[in-house]
């Protein structure tokens, strides 16, 4: 099957926004107008095409970025719907990595919201060109020019309207096109009957003023246009379009559109904007990569006759076909049934079938070309961020960086049958989501799962129940405490049992002392003259190590201590390895009274980014959580606060930060070191653990 759409006529775009700005509805309308969906699905009915996981329909939020293909005016548009909730930034990061352009959807009443700031920053990091769609113009309080102002003030974005709305709220009846200098009037509910009209008289002056501002803004980035503008020559609409496209593709300018996806207004014109102003795979710089063995840098041009190279950006488990690997082809072509090299893992993979996804129905295709986004069936070893390429011409494309998980909970299956299903489920979910981890805690034998936030883990547990039919009980978020000694002391451990027959006898004197942080446990044998025979020494060390797993204060592992065995005694008949092992563990228990044991807790390095006006509240909040502020700096129009805070005080912080900053703050945290728990708090933990 030959290529249907040329590379120049292909657009790979993402739709990004704050939660609830109307992103999924906008995507729905795009699919409706491009003829992919015959009945429009509403999110509040729980039936939107893109939100195809059951949970998304219930919660009305988009969790996984479904990729879908649509056609508009002779162009193929591949759309990736991205989630707007802060716990799912990993999904946004990975979709931005493989896109060529994006549509940022704003709510006309709120303008730029916090998650818009986060996603916008991510898009800037990856150099993704954007157009802006100010949605919900029919909503009470909708204000187009205010929304444009927030783009300047909160994002410092060089954004200018290429359209103006006619009316707002329930009076929103049409749109003025500032490039073509005409207007569009809507007559019916579905917004299919659009009438192109002259700009209404009462809007004429405003349209002239904003067209002037648009030309001025674009001319600053285009010398030829600047000369014409300064000499007062007429600038044609073709020249203006070409200049806007050039400035948008080079990420120096962001055209702003308006409409109401829910009321079916403005979506087709915004689609024209995608075709007119967002880049095709040919317009963006060729992707960089390295040659596996020589580490030389190389590039892959977006051409069908170049060697094949693609990036796997998402793994999904599909109930019918099993594991789906979504990938973006950067160069070359790929046929189903062929073999490729996974250069990241150095393994050959067979491409079973290639599917083009449309939200949740799929079409099988024989071949994909440079610039396409598709899903492959049959890949065994490929995970998110891996490169797939021609094994005769290997390359590793730069992968994606994912943050470490910050919150963990214990989870246990409700029955034996759930146990086996649970380990399969956890393995599959980890393949899909690089920010989710699962492991078994050696000390308690519990299964621990960790992720990016409480909502993230809620959804994981929910998916285990729905997709893998695993019923599990979930614990509260936990902190891994430790214990150590602060003083040195000589301690005796004696175990004697002699009541007829063979007895038990073990007797040791051990000097315990604190070790440096991070040095662990050191054991020294200083016995002279054989008062304790050599064959019992390993048993004494093993006895100490076993006893250290359950500490003397609250049962947490003891770390960073030294133990020096310097004296003891034995019995010819009754001594045994077991007796000395027990004597050693008794010595450790007796040390509790003399060695000043203390509790240690993990301290996290926290970075909070907040708008200036919330700085005071945030500093107060950190102090109330026993945090130490280590430094501050301004970044753009936000303040960055760096602090050390105990992990136990950070639970629920995301929620509290959201409410303290009206959702405009973000934070990251990583483990830094262990530190002594203050006495009053330690006493509470010890009481709780002893069940008092």
From Swiss-Prot:
GO function terms (MF aspect): GTP binding; GTPase activity; translation elongation factor activity
PROSITE patterns referenced in this protein's UniProt entry, alphabetically: G_TR_1 (PS00301), G_TR_2 (PS51722)
Keywords: Cytoplasm, Elongation factor, GTP-binding, Nucleotide-binding, Protein biosynthesis
Pfam families, alphabetized: EFG_C, EFG_III, EFG_IV, GTP_EFTU, GTP_EFTU_D2
Record's keyword annotation contains Cytoplasm: yes
Chain positions recorded as GTP binding sites: 17-24, 81-85, 135-138
GO cellular component: cytoplasm
Entry annotated with the keyword NAD: no
Gene Ontology BP terms: ribosome disassembly
First-listed, main subcellular location of the protein, grouped into a coarse class: cytoplasm
SMART domains according to UniProt: EFG_C (SM00838), EFG_IV (SM00889)
Signal peptide range in chain numbering: none
Domain called tr-type G: residue spans: 8-282
UniProt subcellular location: Cytoplasm
Physiological role: Catalyzes the GTP-dependent ribosomal translocation step during translation elongation. During this step, the ribosome changes from the pre-translocational (PRE) to the post-translocational (POST) state as the newly formed A-site-bound peptidyl-tRNA and P-site-bound deacylated tRNA move to the P and E sites, respectively. Catalyzes the coordinated movement of the two tRNA molecules, the mRNA and conformational changes in the ribosome.
Family indicated by similarity: Belongs to the TRAFAC class translation factor GTPase superfamily. Classic translation factor GTPase family. EF-G/EF-2 subfamily.
Family matches, as NCBIfam families: EF-G (TIGR00484), PRK12740.1-3 (NF009379), PRK12740.1-5 (NF009381), PRK13351.1-1 (NF009891), small_GTP (TIGR00231)
PANTHER family named among the record's database cross-references: RIBOSOME-RELEASING FACTOR 2, MITOCHONDRIAL, TRANSLATION ELONGATION FACTOR G-RELATED
Designated name of the protein: Elongation factor G
Originating organism: Anoxybacillus flavithermus (strain DSM 21510 / WK1)
């Amino acid at each position: 099957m030959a290529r249907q759409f040329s590379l120049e006529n292909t657009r790979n775009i993402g739709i990004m926004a704050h939660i609830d700005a109307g992103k999924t509805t906008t995507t729905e309308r795009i699919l409706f107008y491009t003829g992919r969906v015959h009945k429009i699905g509403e999110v509040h009915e729980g039936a939107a095409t893109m939100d195809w996981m059951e949970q998304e329909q219930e919660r009305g939020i988009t969790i996984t970025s479904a990729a879908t293909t649509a056609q508009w005016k002779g162009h193929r548009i591949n759309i990736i719907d991205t989630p707007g909730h802060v716990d799912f930034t990993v999904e946004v990061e990975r979709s931005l990595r493989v896109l060529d352009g994006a549509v940022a959807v704003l709510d006309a009443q709120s303008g730029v919201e916090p998650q818009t700031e986060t996603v916008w920053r991510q898009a800037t990091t990856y150099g993704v060109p954007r157009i802006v769609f100010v949605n919900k113009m029919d909503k009470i309080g909708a204000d187009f020019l205010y929304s444009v102002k927030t783009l300047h003030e909160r994002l410092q974005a060089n954004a200018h309207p290429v359209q103006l709305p006619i009316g707002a709220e329930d009076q929103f009846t049409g749109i003025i096109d500032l490039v073509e200098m005409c207007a569009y009037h809507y007559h019916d509910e579905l917004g299919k009957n659009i009438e192109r009209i002259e700009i209404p008289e009462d809007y004429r002056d405003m349209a002239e003023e904003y067209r002037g501002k648009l030309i001025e803004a674009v001319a600053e980035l285009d010398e030829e246009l600047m000369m014409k503008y300064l000499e007062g020559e007429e600038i044609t609409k073709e020249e203006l379009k070409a200049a806007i496209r050039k400035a948008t593709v080079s990420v120096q300018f962001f055209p702003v559109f308006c409409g109401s996806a829910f009321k079916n207004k403005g979506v087709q014109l915004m689609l024209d904007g995608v075709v007119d102003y967002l880049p095709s795979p040919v317009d963006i710089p060729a992707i960089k990569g390295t040659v596996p063995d020589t580490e030389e840098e190389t590039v892959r041009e977006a051409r069908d006759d170049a060697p094949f190279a693609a990036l796997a950006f998402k793994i999904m488990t599909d109930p019918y076909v099993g594991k789906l690997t979504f990938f973006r082809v950067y160069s070359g072509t790929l046929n189903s049934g062929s073999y490729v090299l996974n250069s990241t893992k150095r393994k050959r993979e067979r491409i079973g079938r290639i599917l083009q996804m449309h939200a949740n129905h799929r079409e099988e295709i024989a071949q994909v070309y440079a610039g396409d986004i598709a899903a492959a069936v049959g890949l065994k070893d490929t995970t998110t961020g891996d490169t797939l390429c021609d094994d005769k011409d290997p390359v590793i494309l730069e992968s994606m960086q994912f943050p470490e998980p910050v919150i963990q909970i214990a989870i246990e299956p409700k029955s034996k049958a759930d146990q086996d299903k649970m380990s399969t489920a956890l393995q599959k979910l980890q393949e899909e989501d690089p920010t989710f981890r699962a492991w078994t805690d050696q000390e308690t034998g519990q299964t621990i799962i960790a992720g990016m936030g409480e909502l993230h883990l809620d959804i994981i547990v929910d998916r285990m129940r729905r997709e893998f039919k695993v019923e599990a009980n979930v614990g509260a978020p936990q902190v891994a405490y430790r214990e150590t000694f602060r003083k040195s002391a000589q301690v005796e451990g004696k175990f004697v049992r002699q009541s007829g027959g063979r007895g038990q006898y073990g007797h040791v004197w051990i000097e315990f002392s604190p070790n440096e942080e991070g040095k662990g446990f050191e054991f020294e044998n200083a016995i002279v003259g054989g008062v304790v025979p050599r064959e019992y020494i390993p048993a004494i060390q093993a006895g100490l190590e076993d006893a250290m797993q359950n500490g003397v204060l609250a049962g947490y592992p003891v770390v960073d201590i030294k133990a020096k065995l310097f004296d003891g005694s034995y019995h010819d008949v009754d001594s045994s390895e077991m007796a000395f092992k027990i004597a050693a563990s008794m010595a450790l228990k007796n040390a509790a009274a003399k060695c000043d044991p203390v509790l240690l807790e993990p301290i996290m390095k926290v970075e909070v980014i907040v708008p200036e006006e919330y700085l005071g509240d945030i500093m107060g909040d950190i102090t109330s959580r026993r945090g130490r502020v280590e430094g501050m700096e301004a970044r753009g129009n936000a303040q960055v606060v760096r602090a050390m805070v105990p992990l136990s005080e950070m639970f629920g912080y995301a929620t509290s930060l959201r409410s303290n900053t009206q959702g405009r703050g973000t934070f990251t945290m990583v483990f830094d070191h262990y530190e002594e728990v203050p006495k009053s708090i330690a006493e509470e933990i010890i009481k709780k653990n002893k069940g008092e």
